[in-house]
From Swiss-Prot:
Superkingdom classification of source: Bacteria
Role, per record: Possible repressor for genes for mannityl-opine utilization and / or plasmid conjugative transfer.
Pathway it works in: Opine metabolism; mannopine biosynthesis [regulation]
Molecular function terms, GO-annotated: DNA-binding transcription factor activity; transcription cis-regulatory region binding
Keyword DNA-binding: yes
InterPro entries: LacI/GalR-like_sensor, Peripla_BP_I
Protein name (Swiss-Prot/TrEMBL): Probable opine utilization operon repressor
Keywords for the protein's UniProt record, in alphabetical order: DNA-binding, Plasmid, Repressor, Transcription, Transcription regulation
Annotated signal sequence range: none
Entry annotated with the keyword Transcription: yes
Amino acid sequence: VDNFRAAHEAVTSLTGRGHRSIALVSNAPAQGEQQYLISSVRERIDGYRAALHDAQIKISPNLIVLGGWDTKNLADQVRALCISPNRPTAFLATDSSVALVLLGVLREMDLSIPDDVSLICFDDADWTSAITPPLTVISQPVRDLATAATEDLIARLKGETSAPPKETLLPAVLIERGSVSGSSQGRGCIPNSRNVGD
């Protein structure tokens, strides 16, 4: 999957709606942990950065949240980001499990999607279209990926090819649903007063 292009398209759709403070949230290892990012996460971060650069938006390192596999740590980092001076008006989650953590934190802080903040996530998990509002997602061509891998494997097993493995980049598709609005419509990631100091 062309993760760079997919992330770039998602962030460009947000900047096109006026968002200037966009956070990327991932469950990849954080700074200080083993600094190993799988290629798909690295490509998504690179696409995010390139889209901000193309929109002439300064890249703010604190808007890239690498929470590691500990969901409590990830949630704590998102909470801290939501009360920081550089609060996001939109989030890009690198997968649907990260989106679930984001949804929990935003609900806990009494923030509404898309009224207060916008959210786009990678992966068109079944639940993403079943919630209210349904999430805007980056759908990966799972069937096409499986077909391409199977065809390559069968050709190798039959001895039809001795060429080195090839890399095939398949496009992902941005499916716009109800979780994105213009930044001027929302107040951003500002907790309601009843939750401040709780």
